[in-house]
Amino acid sequence: MVKVNIIFHSVHAHIYRMAEAVAAGAREVEGAEVGIYQVPETLPEDVLEKMGAIETKKLFAHIPVVTRDMYEDVLAGADALIFGTPTRYGMMTAQMRAVLDGLGKLWSEDAFVGKVGSVFTSSGTQHGGQESTILSFHVTLLHLGMVIVGLPYAEKRQTIMNEITGGSPYGASTIAGGDGSRQPSENELEMARYQGRHVTQIAKKIAGK
């Protein structure tokens, strides 16, 4: 059985919806054990309320939060990790960064070497830093010794020109709009499903399972 865990940070549920699509794609692979977790939120409740995020966060309140005592099992114990984060100034969010910065002990034990890593993202605008967010995330995965998998052009949905859409060879993505009102399109969700399936297939081959 190949173990795949999706780790995400979401505020207005865009990344959560993409994460669910990634998980659905991963579950299509025979023998896949798929988990989905969110990272701890570090913003205080009054800030979240001003952002209008209290209600949207309730949509995925049932998703377990990955805490430090779970790192060895949930993170190091997986054959593949697929990370989802909104873009913040062209990089991952501080909430996601905090989890990765807590992996020092496991890194020193080579716990992630040879495991598959992949990333998906969202931004408020079409050119809001999606590619730089994924590529800068890859740097950390390489330091951990992971094998990076993206979204190949075999997934033709990323080449369509008749609608606004996220997606690049680096990973699936969605465009939320400046006010967060745009939800992931079916095209974007299908790319996320493809990425989940593709990553899981490769992880299964690498793990020999």
UniProtKB/Swiss-Prot annotation:
Catalytic activity: a quinone + NADH + H(+) = a quinol + NAD(+); a quinone + NADPH + H(+) = a quinol + NADP(+)
GO-annotated cellular components: membrane
Binding, substrate: 107
SUPFAM superfamilies assigned: Flavoproteins
Source superkingdom: Archaea
Cited InterPro entries: Flavodoxin/NO_synth (IPR008254), Flavoprotein-like_sf (IPR029039), Flavoprotein_WrbA-like (IPR010089), FMN_Rdtase-like_dom (IPR005025), NQO (IPR037513)
GO molecular function (one): NADH:ubiquinone reductase (non-electrogenic) activity
Range of residues in the leader sequence: none
Gene3D superfamilies the UniProt entry points to: 3.40.50.360
Pfam (any one): FMN_red
Keywords, comma-separated and alphabetical: Flavoprotein, FMN, NAD, NADP, Nucleotide-binding, Oxidoreductase
Chain sites annotated for binding FMN: 10-15, 87-89, 122-128, 143
Known EC number: 1.6.5.2
Manner of cofactor binding, per the entry note: Binds 1 FMN per monomer.
Cofactor(s) this protein requires: FMN
Keyword field contains Nucleotide-binding: yes
Span of domain Flavodoxin-like: 4-199
PROSITE patterns to which the protein is assigned, alphabetical: FLAVODOXIN_LIKE (PS50902)
Protein family membership: Belongs to the WrbA family.
PANTHER family: FLAVODOXIN-RELATED PROTEIN WRBA-RELATED, FLAVOPROTEIN-LIKE PROTEIN YCP4-RELATED
Protein name (record): NAD(P)H dehydrogenase (quinone)
Organism whose genome encodes this protein: Methanosarcina mazei (strain ATCC BAA-159 / DSM 3647 / Goe1 / Go1 / JCM 11833 / OCM 88) (Methanosarcina frisia)
Source organism phylogeny: Archaea, Methanobacteriati, Methanobacteriota, Stenosarchaea group, Methanomicrobia
